[in-house]
Amino acid sequence: EQGLLDGATPFFAPVPKVNDAQNPFLTNAGAAVWGDAATFIPYTLYRHFRDKGLLKQYLNLMTDWVDWIYRQDEARGGNRLWDFGWQLGDWLALDSGIKGSVFGATDSALIASAYYYISADYTAKMLSVLEDNRSEFYRTLAKEVREKIIHTYFNGDELNTNPVTLQSEVENIRQSMAQNYGGVTIPTAIDTQTGLAVLLRHGLYPNEVARDKLAKRLQEKMDEHNGYLT
């Protein structure tokens, strides 16, 4: 399935046969987080079982997926942000304030770019385990994506809550989908519970001062909702 899609991960495997489908799950492929199963599953299996044979079996799944994202990125100038295409974002999150909405409030470009970094990083690590010299390419790619995320989403050690990604292709598609399906505009934000947690969990901040500020803001967000996730 992945080979037929030039390396993109399908939403379903096997891909269902459809005729004149309008459902984007049936007509699209290659979205962050969902598609990143291609790197997360082999990485997690290796961490638990340390089986290099199994890792080698699924290594192309990892490299093909990251290569597909990289090619899309390069075709748009090599900006090292995944701020283009159709994204699920923080799917089914409850913080948009719109009843019945499947769209969360978190900037989908932030989520997609973070997972671009994570998948490149995981792929580099697994290639290193197998002593494959391709690891350097993915390590460098992960470093470049991480640096771009920090440059885009931080001003010094302060979180930038009005980044350029709020005017990105991803955001325009997201708002168009919200209008088409519900006639609403989504209040997109960076400092959501999800946005803050992703940045903290994966070390996507410039320094420890920034880290502490993110952690404090996440605690405030939790307190605002009486300890509940949104």
Predicted regions and their residues:
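Active-site core of glycosidic bond-cleaving carbohydrate-active enzymes
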Residues: 1-230
